[in-house]
Amino acid sequence: MEIGVDIVEIARIRSSYDRFGEAFMKKILTSAEMAQCLSKPDPVASLAGRFAAKEAVSKALGTGIAKGLTWHSIEVLNDETGKPCVSVYAPSFSGRVSISISHDRYSAVAMALFEPR
C-alpha cells in the first residue's frame, strides 16, 4: 500500500481561475469533472479539492504529475452518494485507488491510498 497527501490553498486556485478562467479548469479537469465542479455552489473550492486529489493520487502512485501521468490521466468523480471515486488512465497502472477529499474556507486537502495488484 502507498499513501499520498496534498493540501492546497483555495485562494491560490481561485487566483489562477480568475486569471485564466475555464481554460485553467480544462487544463486540470476532464469534461465530466468540470461538469460536476460547475454544479457546486462554489466551483473553485471543488476545483481545489480535485487539484489536491490528483496531486495526492500522483504521489501515492510514486510518479507525480508529468512523470507518466497527466492531469487528465486521473479522474475524480463523485458517485450517487457523493463519495469521490478515482479512475486512472495510464498503460502501466494496475491496482485500486481510494480517495478522501475535504475543504474549509481556506484549504482543500486530499489523501489517496493506492493498493497495487
Curated annotation (Swiss-Prot):
Gene3D superfamilies assigned: 4'-phosphopantetheinyl transferase domain
Compartments where found: Cytoplasm
InterPro entries in UniProt: 4-PPantetheinyl_Trfase_dom, 4-PPantetheinyl_Trfase_dom_sf, ACPS, Ppantetheine-prot_Trfase_dom
Catalytic activity: apo-[ACP] + CoA = holo-[ACP] + adenosine 3',5'-bisphosphate + H(+)
One term of GO molecular function: holo-[acyl-carrier-protein] synthase activity
Signal sequence residues: none
Pfam families: ACPS
EC number annotated for this UniProt entry: 2.7.8.7
UniProt cofactor(s): Mg(2+)
Any one GO cellular component localisation term in the record: cytoplasm
Keywords per UniProt: Cytoplasm, Fatty acid biosynthesis, Fatty acid metabolism, Lipid biosynthesis, Lipid metabolism, Magnesium, Metal-binding, Transferase
One BP annotation, GO: fatty acid biosynthetic process
Binding site for Mg(2+): D6, E55
Family per record: Belongs to the P-Pant transferase superfamily. AcpS family.
Function: Transfers the 4'-phosphopantetheine moiety from coenzyme A to a Ser of acyl-carrier-protein.
Protein's name according to its UniProt entry: Holo-[acyl-carrier-protein] synthase
